[in-house]
Amino acid sequence: MNMQLERITQLSILFAVSCFGIVTNTNADMGKEGSHEALELAEDIGRWLAGNAIQNDNGTVWPDNALSPDTIGYDLASGVAGKVVYFVALYRATGNVEYLKMAEGGADYLIGVLQDPSSFEQNPRRASLYTGISGIGVALLHVQRHASDQKYGRAVNQIVNQLGEWSVEDGGGLRWSDEFNDLIYGDAGTALFLSYVAQQTADEEALDLATQGARFLLGQAQESATGSFWYFRRSKPFNLPNFSHGTAGVAYVLATIGTIADDESLRSGAREGFTYIRSISEIEGGLLRIPYGWGADSWAGLYEFGWAHGLSGTASFFARLQISGIDAEAAAEFVSLSRNTLLNINLPGTPAAPFAEPSMALDKRFGRAGVLSLLSQWSVNEPVSEEVVKLRDSILAHIQNAAIRQNRMAHWVVDAPEFMGGGRAAYTGIFHGAAGIGLAVLRLHASINGASPYDTLPDDPFAWPEETKNDVGLKEN
């Protein structure tokens, strides 16, 4: 284990032990009833996804929306890559090789996508983590850990090489996007993926690309009297400070890569981002609010609790800082504030003002599944408070009550917001659909059983310490 990885692991243990205060229960005390209930729902989701799978010449695909089966994406957010990650997680939870075979079928299709440049060349976000080929790489790495065929690892090498070819020297570093800084669409996500590959495979080329991408992002910082922030888009002054499109996500990437590469300038950039987040935070009565953003009238006075624009995601940034030893004491305070707030804003019901009901109530990106995932991870293999268990179980029940369950299958039908096209939808993916809800439920199952997370997404600070062991060996193939 390299020194940087060892440091992250040691700090993560301290983080888990120190963050959560007085405890009155442990996961072992919860019994196996909740574990069985969670796994049953996760497998019902898997059966529904399997029932919507389509076999083609290259492998297995799923429609992004089961009610509109003609739209099939390859990406991590909504497409095939996300379902591949889910079936690998389900395999890890159950040991059922049929789930791994389903994941391999999806991974075979993704390899075919990489062989056909027309699949992604016209995508302006082609390099990105959630909407480009970096997300394909995440899915392939999940499969390669368990597959005997090394072709998935070779395809990851191909992605790293392609990202190297696409990179553009700019501002003392490298970029891939002409427009986006952020985690979902932009250079932050691409650089994070490359660091993820480096951690799992000891790929020095990937780490060099990641580090240079982080240095470009460092140059995109907007200085203020209280720290630095990053715009979502370079051509428009949209300041969305939370995780998915702004400062928390970009600074998360700087903290991650800075720690892996032992680059103090990147760690300092993450610290400046944290200083800015602290400066805009509103703390009252032990509750934390972080504004949605600035740049559109509709964002004024808006606060959310979800992964994308609220506390569930930005708490991951605070956790990454603490794990990485960057302003660890202050970061611990903000982890605690985030936790206390989520426990006291009336979830899983209508959130207490000024927190708003998000555009998608249940999903992993905006809604309650993101909170469930975070709460579950906070209690992995550690003592856990009654309050966390109560909210965790209440969110699971809320999600179950909204599900359509027939013939041992489960899915959700929702009214899609206008920015997603409107109408009724039964989404299948990680961001808005069954796979994302399923991953949150599997996080709960893992936490009850004291297990490591079954999935290891790059933007999850909790999964990295135990799961990245430089043992995939892709460069040997």
Task: Give the label of every model feature segment.
Residues 28-477:
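Glycan-recognition and catalytic cores of secretory/periplasmic carbohydrate-active enzymes
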Residues 11-21:
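Bacterial N-terminal signal peptides
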Residues 8, 23-25:
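Intrinsically disordered/low-complexity terminal segments and short unstructured peptides
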Residues 2-12:
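Bacterial N-terminal signal peptides that target proteins for export
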